[in-house]
């Protein structure tokens, strides 16, 4: 996607353990044959998520960067996105033909959002295991992200969560904004997320 700042930048946020890194991994592996991709992860004091993506073979190591945010992880994607913007600029310098940069936030709360300066599209991941009340609690991630991903639907019977309630609440809180129910462990719902990024982000498939 040719924008004034180069590649399409997709922010992936959500609470710790919701499946953000799993989604990053799957998106890289699914889309890398068709697009020129880089990935940036945010961790407070380590580069664990970036290292996971390298070990998993999501992309070649030179296409994966880890940002150590220190302190408050959501500041690095919102109030002061300079470290992430620098990481994006570095990737663009290395790979001038980049189509897509995926940016994973550090584990954050329901109030964390990406700066529009940093992300063109935002995906917010929550998981069923955290309880079926999560969509009704609102917060910018739930209500204003471009796409809400409700992950780990396979766990619903084990944690007594109602998927129907989660769908109803998500629809009520988000209005016309889309959401997807997923089991990323089995790639269920992944095609809809990829389709959303391609359509909403205006990506043109190579070849």
UniProtKB/Swiss-Prot annotation:
PANTHER family: UREASE ACCESSORY PROTEIN G. Belongs to the SIMIBI class G3E GTPase family. UreG subfamily. This is Urease accessory protein UreG. One of its GO terms (cellular component) is cytoplasm. Facilitates the functional incorporation of the urease nickel metallocenter. This process requires GTP hydrolysis, probably effectuated by UreG. It comes from Bradyrhizobium diazoefficiens (strain JCM 10833 / BCRC 13528 / IAM 13628 / NBRC 14792 / USDA 110). One of its GO terms (molecular function) is GTPase activity. Its main location: cytoplasm.
